[in-house]
């Protein structure tokens, strides 16, 4: 089953388009053959990067060091949903009660 994994950055964490594109490129290389980076969007107070994967938990585990090395985990929320579903499960921050939405 395919899932959509979303990396969401709020506020000024990743508000620069060049920074989003650079992170997408790093993730594309890092996930080659494992998952597909499927683009991004930038809203008024958030930026999202979308990844298609059959293993969202494993994929997050694989990219977590990339995000941590770039000091992006602190301002990030990471969630996933089945490609055919609407309800997201939050992976990061751990034990989050936040209802996840993509604006």
Where do the model's predicted regions map?
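Short, low-order "capping/linker" segments at domain edges
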Residues: 85-103
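Short glycine-/aliphatic-rich beta-strand segments at the starts of folded cytosolic domains
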Residues: 1-14
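Conserved short beta-strand edge segments in small beta-sheet-based binding/regulatory domains
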Residues: 69-86
């Amino acid at each position: 089953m395919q899932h959509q994994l979303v990396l969401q950055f709020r506020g000024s964490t990743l508000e620069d388009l060049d920074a989003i594109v650079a992170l997408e490129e790093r993730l594309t290389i890092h996930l080659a053959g494992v998952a597909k980076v499927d683009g991004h969007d930038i809203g008024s107070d958030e930026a999202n990067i979308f990844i298609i994967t059959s293993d969202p938990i494993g994929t997050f585990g694989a990219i977590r060091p990339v995000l941590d090395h770039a000091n992006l985990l602190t301002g990030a929320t990471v969630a996933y949903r089945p490609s055919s579903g609407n309800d997201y499960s939050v992976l990061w921050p751990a034990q989050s009660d936040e209802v996840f939405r993509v604006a």
